[in-house]
Amino acid sequence: MVHLSSEEKSAVTALWGKVNVEEVGGEALGRLLVVYPWTQRFFESFGDLSSANAVMNNPKVKAHGKKVLAAFSEGLSHLDNLKGTFAKLSELHCDKLHVDPENFRLLGNVLVIVLSHHFGKEFTPQVQAAYQKVVAGVANALAHKYH
């Protein structure tokens, strides 16, 4: 569960309504793979990840980023039950994919950076703080199966 004030919930919802999930998702996942190259081991089937340019222009990275952000978007509709919302994804990433749960936190932080880049002054310190709470809650929910 993420504890957000009504103002924080409104800020998150208002900004999210303007997010291009495909564009932001691809950019966030791409940046994760570039900045934290060890995360690429989970995406060997994606083809060329040999350079930042290759990663950022890789159609499979973009498609998976969109998928990740679509799941995140679903979570925003269930802020009071993130563990339940992400239970199956947590199980998949833990039991089958063996993803280090720290990667969820890293991706959340990268997402906040990408949102800041896309929305500039509209991404105020208050909005940023609310999104930090949300991405921390999502990362915690995704890591739940690991505990």
From Swiss-Prot:
One of its GO terms (molecular function) is oxygen carrier activity. Heme b binds at H64, H93. The modification S-nitrosocysteine is found at C94. GO terms for biological process: hydrogen peroxide catabolic process. Residues 3-147 form the Globin domain. The modification Phosphothreonine is found at T13. The modification N6-acetyllysine is found at K60, K83, K145. The modification N-acetylvaline is found at V2. Keywords: Acetylation, Heme, Iron, Metal-binding, Oxygen transport, Phosphoprotein, S-nitrosylation, Transport. The keyword RNA-binding does not apply. SUPFAM superfamilies: Globin-like. Heterotetramer of two alpha chains and two beta chains. Involved in oxygen transport from the lung to the various peripheral tissues. This is Hemoglobin subunit beta-1/2. It comes from Oryctolagus cuniculus. The gene is HBB1.
